[in-house]
C-alpha cells in the first residue's frame, strides 16, 4: 500500500526543467537586463556626456532632460543591444565553454532574444531620430559596427586589431560625436579629440583579453595578448593610451586651452604607477588597472570636453 506522498507524486504532472518553466514579467525583465550587461554601459554613457559638454551648448534648462535621454540611449539601450547581439552570436561557442550562460543554459530563449533585440532597436532608433539626424547617423553606424564585431561573415572579434577598433570607435568616438551633435553642430576640434580617445580606448579594450588568453587561443581568436604575448600586449595597452593622451594635451595647448591641457597632463602622469604595475603582471593587476589608470583616463576625457566648451 503506497503512502500519500507516493500518490501525490503519481497524480501530479511532471515538473518542467527550470529553463522550460513559464517566466513572469519580472523574471523576463531581470533576464533581459542581465543579458544587456549593465557593467558595460558606463563607457558610451560617459562619452556621450563628454561630447555634449564639448558642444558648449549644454545648459541647466531643458537640455538636461535631453542629455539624460541621450545618455540612456547610448548606455542601457544601444550598448545593451550590442551585448545581446554578441551573446546571441556566441551561443554555440558558449554552449561548449560556458554552458551556464543565459542563452546556452536555456534561461533565455531565442524568442526572448529576438523580442528584446527588436524592442531595443526600436527604442534606440526612436530616441536617435528625436535627437537629430546626425545623432541617428552615428547610431546607425554604431549598430553596423556592432553587427560587424559579432556576426559572420566579418565577425571582427576574431582579430584583436579589428574587433577592438570597432568597439573603441563605437563606445568612445561615435558616442562622443553623437553627444555633441545632439546639442550643436560638430566641430573639427571635437571630432579630433573623440577620435584620439577612441585610439586610447583600443588599448583599454585589450585589458579585458588577458583573462581569456587560453580560451581565445583554443578558439582561434587572435586577441592582442594571443598575438604578442602578455608583456608586449600590456606595453601596447599603456603606449596606446599614453600616445592618445599626449596628442590631446598638445592639441589643447595649441587651441588655447592651457588649463584643460594641464589637467589632462597631470592625470596622465598619475597613470605611471598603475601602468608599471600592469606591465609587470597584467593578468593579476587587471582590476587595479581598471580602477586607477583607466579611471584617470576617463576623467581626462571630461577635462578635455570642458576645455573645448570654454
Curated annotation (Swiss-Prot):
UniProt subcellular location: Cell membrane
GO MF terms held by the record: transferase activity, transferring alkyl or aryl (other than methyl) groups
Record's GO cellular component terms: plasma membrane
Signal peptide start-end: none
UniProt topology in membrane: Multi-pass membrane protein
GO biological process: light-independent bacteriochlorophyll biosynthetic process; photosynthesis
Region Disordered, residue ranges: 1-20
Pfam families: UbiA
Alphabetical list of InterPro entries matching this protein: Chl_synth (IPR006372), Prenyltransferase_related (IPR050475), UbiA_prenyltransferase (IPR000537), UbiA_sf (IPR044878)
Regions of compositional bias (Polar residues) in chain numbering: 1-13
Origin: domain of life: Bacteria
Sorted UniProt keywords: Bacteriochlorophyll biosynthesis, Cell membrane, Chlorophyll biosynthesis, Membrane, Photosynthesis, Transmembrane, Transmembrane helix
Transmembrane segments: 39-59, 67-87, 112-132, 134-154, 166-186, 187-207, 248-268, 287-307
The protein's annotated pathway: Porphyrin-containing compound metabolism; bacteriochlorophyll biosynthesis (light-independent)
Record function comment: Catalyzes the esterification of bacteriochlorophyllide a by geranylgeraniol-PPi.
Protein name (Swiss-Prot/TrEMBL): Bacteriochlorophyll synthase 34 kDa chain
Species annotation: Chloroflexus aurantiacus (strain ATCC 29366 / DSM 635 / J-10-fl)
Higher taxonomy: Bacteria, Bacillati, Chloroflexota, Chloroflexia, Chloroflexales
Gene: bchG
